[in-house]
Amino acid sequence: MVLLWGTFLLVCTRYLVPISVRYIMSDLRDGNLVEKSKRLVWARFNQYTAGEMRLLETYLSRINPRDPESSRVQFTLAEYKELLGRPEIDVRNVKPQLDHFLGNVVTIEGIKNGAPAWDMYTLFTRATCLYDEDLRQYVISINCNPELRSVFFNLAEDGYIRYRLRYTKNMKSQYSIKLYGMLRDWLHHGAYTVPIERLREELGATEKSYCAFKPFRVRVLDPAVSEINAISDLK
C-alpha cells in the first residue's frame, strides 16, 4: 500500500493485488460465470448491503447477458435467505427486505454532449413471491429495470469483465465485492493511481466516519483487500 499526497497507487496483476422464461437453480453453483458490463462495474451502490450485492452477483450469473428475454430470474426462498445472510427471513417477513432491495438507487456516470453526466436508477423494478407447487417451496422472482436492459445485456458495446461466481458470492463486505470488480477492470492497466476521495465514492463508503483516511483504511480498505486475497483469484 502506497499513499502519495492523498492518492492510492493500485498495482494490479493477475495474481497480485497490493494495496497498503424461468430459471431456478437447485443450488447456488459457485462455478457459474458472471459477465458484468463496465457501466455496472463503475456504478455507485451507496445503499446496497453486502447481501444485496451477493444477490446481484448471483442474478448476473443466471441471466444470459446476450438475451434480454432472460431478465426474469427466480430464487428459492432458501437461496434468497442464504445470499442475504438472513436466516430469520420467511414468507411472512420477506416483503420489507424486498422493498429495500427494489428501492435501492444506483448512480451510473457517463459522458453526454461532451460533458460528464450521470443518471440515477433502481436496477430492479419488480419482485414476485409465490408458492411453487412443483418445488413445494416459495420462490422469489426479480426483473431488472427495462430502462437498464442495455446495462445488463449490451456487453459488446459497453465492454465487460467476467469471472466465476465463487470469487464474490461468499464475500461478507459490499466493499470487497465492489473493489473486486474494479480491480478486475484494472488488471491490464498495471499501476493505477486513484485519488482517495474518488476511491471512497466508487466503493460507496461515503459515511462521515470515513472522511479521515485512517478509519477508511482500517474499516473499509484493509478488510476488503484481505477478503479479496483470501477468497478470490486475485492474490
Annotate the PLM regions.
Residues 3-235:
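Charged, alpha-helix-forming regions
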